[in-house]
UniProtKB/Swiss-Prot annotation:
Disruption phenotype: Strains lacking psmA1 gene alone display relatively normal growth rate and overall cell yield, but they are more sensitive to growth on organic versus inorganic nitrogen sources and hypo-osmotic stress, and they show limited growth in the presence of L-canavanine. Abolition of alpha1 subunit synthesis also has a severe impact on the ability of cells to withstand thermal stress. Moreover, depletion of psmA1 and psmA2 together renders the cells inviable. Pfam families: Proteasome, Proteasome_A_N. Acetylated. The acetylated form at Met-1 was shown to be in 100-fold excess of the unacetylated form with the initiator methionine removed in whole cells and purified 20S proteasomes. This is Proteasome subunit alpha 1. GO terms for cellular component: cytoplasm; proteasome core complex, alpha-subunit complex. The lineage of its organism: Archaea, Methanobacteriati, Methanobacteriota, Stenosarchaea group, Halobacteria.
Length: 252
């Protein structure tokens, strides 16, 4: 009985390590990320691609109300997987830090600098009592002085830099597809195609344009740009990934 009570203390206490060195609440937050729909990031010499699966849970839901990719600054985009409300809080924090940097130094914030400020903020919530970890992972992508950068954050507050990465549901399958098909010399268009192929790789049906978000930050312009549904549809159609009417009827 006493052992069970001690186990529950480790389980519930965010600031208490278990005897084997684990923080259970942080691990549970990682499980929340796995339950979220996938987001994919691809870094190419021509820029960064962010793509997110945003298939709605019901045909009655407005697809435009589901946002998975956000603009943090003119040259930075953020994609999320996990609790949407937690993601919104972190994205707002990232936007504030970006603006503070512009006001203080008169220049855009660096991608690595912003990522570390966000992860420092996340990490504080793994050490403070009376709070819980953020149940979300982020992909922070952008261009800094002509160099594309792509980072992942996780609920522990650890940053990782990637060439291509997936977060959220089916991460293992998506990551396997990325590892098999990624090349260091990908163009930006090929990066978009790879991200869409990775998302589609875990679905028996095709992908609808309103079921996925895609954004890029070009190394040439250093500008965050979201693709329209028509542009996404053209990429899906060109790569034989577009959902047909038969697929949509099957889903329903």
């Amino acid at each position: 009985m006493q052992g069970q009570a001690q186990q529950q203390a480790y389980d519930r206490g965010i600031t208490i390590f278990s005897p084997d060195g684990r923080l259970y609440q942080v691990e549970y937050a990682r499980e929340a990320v796995k339950r979220g729909t996938a987001s994919i990031g691809v870094r190419t010499p021509e820029g960064v691609v962010l793509a997110a699966d945003k298939r709605s849970r019901s045909p009655l839901m407005e697809p435009t109300s589901v946002e998975k990719i956000h603009k943090a600054d003119d040259h930075i985009g953020i994609a999320s997987a996990g609790h949407v409300a937690d993601a919104r809080q972190l994205i707002d924090f990232a936007r504030r830090q970006s603006q503070v940097n512009r006001l203080r130094y008169g220049e855009p914030i660096g991608i690595e600098t912003l990522t570390k400020e966000v992860t420092d903020h996340i990490q504080q919530y793994t050490q403070v009592g009376g709070a819980r970890p953020f149940g979300v992972a982020l992909l922070i992508g952008g261009v800094e002085n002509g160099t594309p950068r792509l980072y992942e954050t996780d609920p522990s507050g650890t940053p990782y830099e990637w060439k291509a990465v997936s977060i959220g549901a089916d991460r293992g399958d998506h990551q396997e597809h990325l590892e098999e098909n990624f090349r260091d010399d990908l163009t930006l268009d090929e990066g978009i195609e790879l991200a869409l192929e990775a998302i589609a790789s875990t679905s028996d049906e095709g992908t609808a344009p309103d079921g996925v978000d895609v954004a890029t930050v070009s190394a040439e312009t250093e500008r965050f740009v979201e693709l329209s549904n028509d542009e996404i549809e053209s990429y899906l159609e060109a790569n034989d990934l577009l959902a047909t009417e038969d697929d949509e009827q099957t889903e329903e």
